[in-house]
């Protein structure tokens, strides 16, 4: 199977499963605990009925919309995803170029494998930076200032990841960042030689927004759950979010809002948007 034979989401998923070592595939494909939330997220699309109105003249269709004051040609954008270079050696560079091709916004994770500076030099379409609130205040300030200097349009503070999700697939496969060989994963990596060749020859794996402050994730192997549980500030509250919103001074969103009450609080502290999300069921099942 190749890309030209992929015609829907399931085709792409099957191709990824064939191309990626098991720990890498199950990290991106999996979720927390029994994955009930994850499966409900997927099946929910089957519950949506579309009732089209006809005879409207569709020779010219406009899908554009405005988000955070930016006009996008599509009514959706690329949400931030961590560690993209693990899935393909071009990582965020490829996704950013795709977002620019279709004139939509590109979300960059704090755990990205390409820096905000490089992304800014690569594309000129709208960009969002997703931010995790770390215990290290110097790291927090650095992330905000670098994104601001790189002229990112939106800052999104993730608020549903106070601790790491219990991702049972990762426990079974031994997934870490950066990847390491274990007895459980050795065979899987050995049977995907092209992934290994690309990983070793296409530039060093690094987390450029974090590596000057923490070793974990770049030079020291760690699970994502352990990283979140030890590095993120579990005392984060509404006062912290309000200060960050003021410090950013531009479009600011909270990512992970699930209740009307919290949505109203987000408006009260100055947010210009919210991202209604359960993190794909990857944090709380």
Task: Describe the residue ranges of each PLM region.
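Alpha/beta enzyme core
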Residues: 83, 97, 118, 122, ...
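A gly/proline- and charged-residue-enriched helix-loop-helix capping module
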Residues: 101-122, 126-140
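Hydrophobic faces of well-ordered beta-strands that scaffold small-molecule active sites
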Residues: 76-79, 104-108, 127-131, 155, ...
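A generic secondary-structure signal marking the coil-to-beta-strand transition
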Residues: 46, 68-76, 125, 153
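Glycine- and other small-residue-rich loops at beta-strand/loop junctions that grip anionic moieties
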Residues: 30, 84, 88, 108-111, ...
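Glycine-rich active-site/cofactor-binding loop and its immediate structural neighborhood
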Residues: 72-111, 116
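An N-cap/entry alpha-helix motif that binds or orients negatively charged groups
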Residues: 1-69, 178-236
């Amino acid at each position: 199977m190749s890309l030209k034979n992929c015609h829907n989401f399931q085709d792409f998923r099957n191709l990824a499963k064939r191309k990626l070592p098991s720990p890498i595939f199950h990290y991106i494909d999996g979720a927390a605990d029994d994955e009930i939330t994850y499966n409900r997220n997927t099946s929910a699309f089957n519950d949506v009925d579309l009732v089209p109105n006809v005879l409207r003249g569709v020779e010219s269709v406009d899908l554009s919309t405005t988000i955070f004051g930016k006009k996008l040609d599509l009514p959706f954008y690329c949400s931030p995803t961590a560690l993209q270079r693990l899935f393909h050696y071009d990582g965020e560079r490829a996704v950013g170029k795709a977002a620019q091709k279709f004139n939509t916004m590109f979300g960059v994770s704090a755990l990205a494998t390409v820096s905000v500076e490089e992304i800014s030099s690569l594309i000129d379409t709208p960009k969002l930076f997703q931010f995790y609130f770390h215990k290290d205040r110097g790291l927090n300030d650095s992330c905000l200032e670098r994104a601001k200097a790189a002229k990112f349009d939106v800052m999104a503070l993730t608020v549903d990841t106070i601790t790491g999700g219990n991702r049972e697939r990762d426990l079974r496969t031994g997934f870490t960042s950066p990847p390491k060989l274990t007895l459980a994963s050795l065979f899987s990596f050995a049977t995907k030689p092209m992934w290994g060749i690309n990983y070793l020859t296409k530039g060093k794996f690094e987390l450029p927004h974090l590596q000057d402050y923490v070793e974990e994730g770049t030079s020291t192997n760690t699970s994502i759950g352990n990283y979140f549980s030890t590095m993120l500030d579990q005392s984060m509250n509404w006062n912290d979010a309000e200060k960050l919103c003021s410090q950013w001074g531009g479009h600011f969103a909270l990512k992970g809002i699930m209740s009307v009450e919290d949505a109203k609080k987000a408006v009260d502290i100055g947010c210009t948007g919210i991202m209604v999300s359960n993190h794909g069921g990857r944090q709380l099942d």
